[in-house]
Amino acid sequence: LPDELHGQFDYLLEYICFCAVSPSRRFEYDRVAWQLLRSGGMLLGLFFPLDKPLAEGGPPWGVTISELHQLFSLHWHLDREETPVDSIDPRRGREVLQYWRKP
């Protein structure tokens, strides 16, 4: 991404982009999100699917809450985490909503 975009955003909304990124490249997703947000900015993510083993391939690539914590807690602060109660039926119980803040 162009340097002029670095630090220009208060919020990034994640919805089904992360699950399309190969697990071997998710560190790049983390890096780009970090670059785009200004200090205090928020990455608001609805991460999916939590119940799909990586061995099944993708996309969508599976992810666990533990993996999300491992990736993002290195640089971010987790402000909130919840399981959505009003998901559509095919995704109910298979996604997590997380609010990550850039210090």
Annotate the PLM regions.
Residues 16-20:
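Short catalytic micro-motifs in class I SAM-dependent methyltransferases
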Residues 13:
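A conserved beta-strand element that flanks and buttresses the S-adenosyl-L-methionine
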Residues 10:
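Conserved acidic residues
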Residues 1-7, 21-103:
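Class I (Rossmann-like) S-adenosyl-L-methionine-dependent methyltransferase catalytic domain
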